[in-house]
């Protein structure tokens, strides 16, 4: 099962993420958990989230980039749900062997991520990748949709189809 952890603080203003979800939902075995819809008060039901994760084979963190990072509710979700003894540490093997895909949208182009001595978008994924590896997850190459503020409908649609194709390819590779 593919579990999409969707963290968009303003989902009604989204064009790119909305299309990505629409395409992903056409696949069998996809569950979407919209964190800002489920937890507007930031009071996360840890047991429910861990139960959803336990059913997943592929976990997707889908969100818009905010100040070169993840939205605050997704950060809190990781802090609370990936708990010691469950996701890591002694007895913390619940996520071992599962896959993680970071699916992120950005308003700027790739050149916006040429930062200092460590240029490139990949540098921004390192904390997420380290978290995944520490918890025994298999980190997949990220899916990034850039320039979403200026993309025309045809480009957004094409990128959303590409996202669906990435998910489908994962399903075919791991569940034939």
From Swiss-Prot:
Catalytic activity: a quinone + NADH + H(+) = a quinol + NAD(+); a quinone + NADPH + H(+) = a quinol + NADP(+)
Enzyme kind, highest EC tier: oxidoreductase
Subcellular compartments: Cell inner membrane
Known function: Regulatory subunit of a potassium efflux system that confers protection against electrophiles. Required for full activity of KefC. Shows redox enzymatic activity, but this enzymatic activity is not required for activation of KefC.
Record-level Gene Ontology MF annotations: electron transfer activity; FMN binding; NADH:ubiquinone reductase (non-electrogenic) activity; NADPH dehydrogenase (quinone) activity
Self-association state and partner proteins as the record states: Homodimer. Interacts with KefC.
Swiss-Prot/TrEMBL keywords: Cell inner membrane, Cell membrane, Flavoprotein, FMN, Membrane, NAD, Oxidoreductase
Main subcellular location: membrane
Organism: Escherichia fergusonii (strain ATCC 35469 / DSM 13698 / CCUG 18766 / IAM 14443 / JCM 21226 / LMG 7866 / NBRC 102419 / NCTC 12128 / CDC 0568-73)
Name of this chain's protein: Glutathione-regulated potassium-efflux system ancillary protein KefF
Domain of life of the native organism: Bacteria
Protein residues bound to FMN: 8, 14-17, 65-68, 105-108
NCBIfam families, alphabetized: PRK00871.1 (NF002044)
EC annotation from Swiss-Prot or TrEMBL: 1.6.5.2
GO BP terms, alphabetized: positive regulation of potassium ion transmembrane transport; potassium ion transport
Family from the record: Belongs to the NAD(P)H dehydrogenase (quinone) family. KefF subfamily.
Keyword Amino-acid biosynthesis belongs to the record: no
GO cellular component: plasma membrane
Pfam family, one: Flavodoxin_2
């Amino acid at each position: 099962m593919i579990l999409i952890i969707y963290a968009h603080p303003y989902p009604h203003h989204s064009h790119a993420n909305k299309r990505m979800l629409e395409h992903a939902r056409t696949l069998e075995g996809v569950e979407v958990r919209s964190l800002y819809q489920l937890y507007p008060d930031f009071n996360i039901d840890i047991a429910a989230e861990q139960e959803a994760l336990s059913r997943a084979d592929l976990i997707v963190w889908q969100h818009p980039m905010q100040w070169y990072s993840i939205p605050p509710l997704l950060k809190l979700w990781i802090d609370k749900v990936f708990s010691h003894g469950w996701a890591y540490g002694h007895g913390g093997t619940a996520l071992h062997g599962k896959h993680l895909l970071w699916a992120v949208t950005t308003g700027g182009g790739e050149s916006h991520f040429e930062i200092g001595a460590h240029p490139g978008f990949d540098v921004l994924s390192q904390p997420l990748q380290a978290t995944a590896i520490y918890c025994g997850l298999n980190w997949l190459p990220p899916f990034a949709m850039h320039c979403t503020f200026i993309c025309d409908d045809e480009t957004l649609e094409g990128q959303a189809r590409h996202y669906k194709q990435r998910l489908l390819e994962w399903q075919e590779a791991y569940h034939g």
